[in-house]
């Protein structure tokens, strides 16, 4: 009986992906490394899977002391998903943590596959088309989250003896069918700002919104994609950018959100630098907008993501943002208690 080793459960993606992996392999069991503070939630979410899931308390920040057994497949999703993370913490979790999982995988004698969830934003602020085989192209990074995820992917690629596959999601939002999510970030900052306003809403807009694109994919697409691609033998040693190949411009994205929110939006243009300075240094601005300065960078993002491998190997298409945005808005309006923080 094969064992799947899994990090990132019961997180935003892991909670949905683990049951899918086990459904695909009825004979498999899962060994989930979970931080002690999340262990009760992990056990609750694993309950429908019965004795097929074993929760082991631990942390990727330290060398892994867990039984290797007959682990044949590793899914590494755990990371710090925080644009404001310090470099020290990002290095400890995203880079050293990935190194510890890689070390564990190399000790697994039955290992057949290693699946690593990276991010499109290892591109940093690269100008132009960033391809699935690109990594170090001399890019500058917006923040330590991007930099440490980049360095973590370098670690994975440097382990040339491991049978690895890399998945790079773009900005992930809630389920395209239900709108459900565990965190409000990315476009949700705009959704929440607009929902707090009257029918005619004022929205600060940075840069040139008709030039830049905002790449959004729903969680269910990411889960479907990883589930399918991880089962393919020919996905071995490939990288897949799980992104919209034809994303809306920022301006189009804002208009879709406005319509879904039943608002008419008056745009107030601001430069990127002025917007970030005001949020960080002008008293009351952050409390009013509730948009972190680091999020501003993604509304003037200069990178386009090539998805050639994904389009070739995945018989699924990314749902169009305009087709499900109303569900995201409805869920956000009904759940004001959800925050922007994501589970590591």
Predicted regions located by residue number:
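Glycine/proline-rich active-site loop of Rossmann-fold NAD(P)-dependent oxidoreductases
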Residues: 175-188, 228-240
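NAD(P)H-binding glycine-rich loop region in Rossmannoid oxidoreductase-like domains
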Residues: 57-96, 106-108
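N-terminal Rossmann NAD(P)H-binding glycine-rich loop of SDR-like oxidoreductase domains
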Residues: 2-25
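Conserved Rossmann-fold NAD(P)-dependent oxidoreductase catalytic core, especially the SDR/UDP-sugar
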Residues: 88, 92, 96-144, 165
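A conserved pocket-lining segment of Rossmann-fold NAD(P)-dependent short-chain dehydrogenase/reductase
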Residues: 86, 178, 187-221, 225-229
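Active-site Tyr-X1-5-Lys
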Residues: 140-170, 175
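Mid/C-terminal beta-alpha module of Rossmann-like enzyme folds, strongest
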Residues: 228-291, 327-344
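Amphipathic terminal alpha-helices
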Residues: 25-28, 305-344
């Amino acid at each position: 009986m094969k064992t799947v080793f899994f990090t990132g459960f019961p997180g935003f993606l892991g909670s949905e992906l683990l049951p899918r992996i086990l459904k695909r392999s009825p004979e498999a069991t899962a060994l989930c490394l979970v931080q002690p503070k999340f262990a009760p939630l992990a056990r609750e979410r694993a309950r429908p899977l019965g004795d097929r899931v074993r929760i082991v308390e631990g942390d990727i920040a330290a060398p892994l002391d867990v039984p290797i057994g007959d682990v044949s497949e590793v899914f590494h999703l755990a990371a710090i998903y925080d644009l404001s993370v310090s470099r020290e913490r990002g290095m400890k979790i995203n880079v050293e943590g990935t190194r510890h999982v890689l070390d564990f995988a190399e000790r697994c004698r039955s290992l057949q596959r290693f699946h690593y969830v990276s991010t499109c934003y290892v591109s940093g602020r690269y100008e132009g088309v960033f391809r699935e085989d690109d990594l170090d192209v001399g890019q500058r990074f917006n923040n330590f989250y991007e930099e440490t995820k980049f360095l973590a992917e370098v670690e994975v690629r440097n382990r040339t003896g491991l049978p690895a596959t890399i998945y790079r999601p773009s900005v992930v939002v809630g389920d395209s069918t239900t709108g459900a999510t565990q965190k409000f970030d990315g476009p949700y900052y705009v959704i929440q700002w607009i929902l707090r306003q009257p029918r005619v809403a004022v929205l600060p807009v940075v840069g040139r919104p008709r030039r830049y694109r905002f790449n959004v994919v729903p969680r269910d697409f990411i889960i479907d994609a990883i589930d399918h691609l991880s089962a393919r033998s020919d996905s071995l040693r490939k990288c897949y950018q799980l992104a919209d190949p034809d994303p809306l411009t920022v301006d189009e994205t804002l208009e879709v959100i406005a319509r879904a929110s039943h608002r008419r939006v008056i745009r107030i243009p601001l430069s990127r630098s002025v917007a970030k300075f005001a949020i960080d240094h002008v008293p009351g601005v952050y409390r009013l907008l509730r948009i972190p300065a680091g999020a501003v960078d993604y509304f003037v993002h200069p990178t386009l993501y090539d998805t050639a491998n994904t389009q070739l190997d995945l018989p699924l298409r990314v749902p169009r943002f305009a087709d499900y945005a109303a569900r995201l808005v409805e869920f956000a309006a009904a759940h004001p208690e959800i925050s922007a923080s994501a589970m590591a």
